[in-house]
Curated annotation (Swiss-Prot):
Residues 1-5 are periplasmic. Belongs to the ZipA family. The gene is zipA. Residues 120-139 are annotated as: Disordered. Essential cell division protein that stabilizes the FtsZ protofilaments by cross-linking them and that serves as a cytoplasmic membrane anchor for the Z ring. Also required for the recruitment to the septal ring of downstream cell division proteins. This is Cell division protein ZipA. GO terms for cellular component: cell division site; plasma membrane. GO terms for biological process: division septum assembly; FtsZ-dependent cytokinesis. It is a single-pass type I membrane protein.
Length: 277
């Protein structure tokens, strides 16, 4: 019995010593961690101070966010739009041709020829309306620039596909049942150029486009015209090329030949020789 008490006493003393030593070790570990954290913070602060000093020496100050100034609103929007050029690319798009494929069949040429006079008449009517609306006192000789977009030999453009491409090129269905590219100024629409069916009678019936097909279309503009004729023609050429690319067709000149750089220069020469409105 005496031996058991002695063993329990000895065990208690050993336990107390172990707990004491563990407490001392834990306290030292905590102090070491606190010291390390403080040392790290001091080091980081020192690095930040050095970086700020370097920035000051280099002349780099605090970053400031500048608010964009609100745009000035023109009092006379019509005057601004009148002098504003129609957006277009500075260079003509590269025209893609397939010289191994015939442009249009002979029968298509016969149909196309029947509409040449009608196109001229439509163009004259449109320019006459525009002249009466905007420049009633100016009487000048009318000239017409024409581009054709034709399907490859023995092929036709389907009506639905053609209509989608025409609308994608920002044409709108309007007067004389053909499409027009408009410039809108203060609620007033001005025709820049127009698009008609290449074959007789030249107009479109939107209700029958699903069952309609054609070997090609004609895009035309009159001279003199509103604004800058050269910019209008660039836009017309880009529209013709876009439709041709989407439909797999060809861009032809007014003689229904493959358009060439020389022909484009002839068009531009005609534009330069025409007085402005």
């Amino acid at each position: 019995m005496q031996d058991l008490r002695l063993m329990l006493l000895l065990f208690g003393v050993i336990t107390i010593i172990v707990l004491f030593l563990h407490g001392v070790w834990a306290r030292r570990k905590e102090r070491s961690a606190l010291f390390y954290d403080q040392k790290t913070k001091d080091q980081n602060q020192k690095e930040d101070d050095v970086l700020l000093q370097i920035l000051d020496e280099e002349g780099v100050g605090e970053v400031k966010i500048l608010k964009k100034a609100p745009p000035n609103v023109e009092k006379n929007a019509f005057d601004k739009a009148h002098h504003k050029k129609i957006p277009s690319q500075t260079k003509y798009q590269a025209l893609k041709f397939d010289s191994s494929v015939a442009c249009v069949t002979a029968s298509s040429f016969a149909q196309i020829s029947e509409t040449e006079t009608q196109l001229q008449k439509k163009s004259d009517d449109l320019s006459h309306q525009s002249k009466e609306t905007h420049h009633p006192s100016i009487q000048k000789e009318q000239k017409v620039l024409v581009l054709h977009v034709a399907a490859h030999s023995s092929r036709n453009f389907s009506g639905e596909t053609l209509l989608k491409s025409i609308l994608n090129s920002h044409f709108q269905f309007g007067d004389m049942n053909i499409f027009h590219r408009y410039l809108t100024l203060t609620g007033e629409r001005i025709t820049l150029f127009s698009l008609a069916n290449m074959v007789k009678p030249g107009f479109f019936d939107l209700k029958k486009m699903a069952h309609f097909s054609t070997p090609g279309i004609s895009i035309f503009m009159t001279l003199p015209c509103y604004g800058h004729a050269s910019e209008n023609f660039k836009l017309m050429l880009q529209s013709a090329q876009k439709i041709a690319d989407e439909l797999g067709g060809l861009v032809l000149d007014d003689q229904r030949q493959m358009i060439t750089p020389q022909k484009l220069e002839d068009y531009n020469a005609l534009i330069r020789s025409t007085p402005h409105l």
